[in-house]
Amino acid sequence: MEGINLNQIGVSFKGSGSYVPNQILTNQEISKKVETSDEWIKSRTGISQRRISGLSENVSEMGYKAALGAIEMARWDIETIDLIILATSTPNDLFGSAPEIQSKLGAINAVAFDLTAACSGFLFAAITATQFLKAGSYKRAVVIGSDQLSSYVDWNDRRSCILFGDGAGAIAIEGTNELDNLLGFSMRTDGQRGSFLNLPSQNNQDLIINDINFSSGGFSSIKMNGQEVYKFAVREVPLIIDNLFKKTNFNSEKINWLLLHQANQRILDSVGERLNVSTEKILSNLSNYGNTSAATIPLMLDEAIRNKKIKENDIIATSGFGAGLSWGAALIRWG
């Protein structure tokens, strides 16, 4: 859809949705595959189980179902959506899975594209969407985080296979000329530390014609230096949120909720402690779903909204962090 040049000064958050596969993989079941135990996994990660996609499920299908939930909560007509951004690192079409979601929704007036920033992806995508809306280019946006990391896990590596699950979440955002509910944001990247967490390409030489080498593309499994990623998260995430507090004249007492990327319960607890955020304000569903990458924040958000935990006008400090290395934070007022 063409830009509509509205006089919008802010955004409002109109709806949320989520979807997780039916298949549940427990710690006990993983312990039959690798040398580990339920107690070992829970004590180090806080995870008890995770959802795994079935053969007929993929990023587009999960993202579509999450988006539908957000659109229904917002009570929008599908044709009024201008923008769809899919945050994913595991598209079922490497050229982009957002157009497939657009097609499934029937959102014929929306431009749709993928954004890749790993576990920071949803936050980065949501911030990107708000800037289009605040510029007056579009009126209504759906932002989706959907990932299927189970397809890229080395199921013989107990350090990483215990962490990840599949799922999707989405939010509906609308441009407004009233109060801006995006109170502030910050985004950062440090590519020099990218090797701490990555999913590298893997090329295989297949054919030689006239001394020209041809290779088929592919990817290996997730590579992670858990200790370095932990140190990165507990150092950088409190810092970026605290700096955002200072810029917006907020503090830990003025927020209602702390919503972090659901990577590891130890990280959530440590960040909360460093920010002096009380435990009851820290949102966590990590035990049930594990790390669903770009889906963790909207999945937790939707769960808290539908359980009537998060209410209209609640102030939420949120942060995504992960591969890149990338990290960011946003302060929002829900509604």
From Swiss-Prot:
Keywords recorded for this protein, A-Z: Acyltransferase, Cytoplasm, Fatty acid biosynthesis, Fatty acid metabolism, Lipid biosynthesis, Lipid metabolism, Multifunctional enzyme, Transferase
Entry EC number(s): 2.3.1.180
Pathway of action: Lipid metabolism; fatty acid biosynthesis
Main location, first listed in the record: cytoplasm
Subunit structure: Homodimer.
Family: Belongs to the thiolase-like superfamily. FabH family.
HAMAP family the record matches: FabH (MF_01815)
PANTHER family: 3-OXOACYL-[ACYL-CARRIER-PROTEIN] SYNTHASE, BETA-KETOACYL-[ACYL-CARRIER-PROTEIN] SYNTHASE III, CHLOROPLASTIC
Protein name as catalogued: Beta-ketoacyl-[acyl-carrier-protein] synthase III
Species of provenance: Prochlorococcus marinus subsp. pastoris (strain CCMP1986 / NIES-2087 / MED4)
Organism lineage string: Bacteria, Bacillati, Cyanobacteriota, Cyanophyceae, Synechococcales
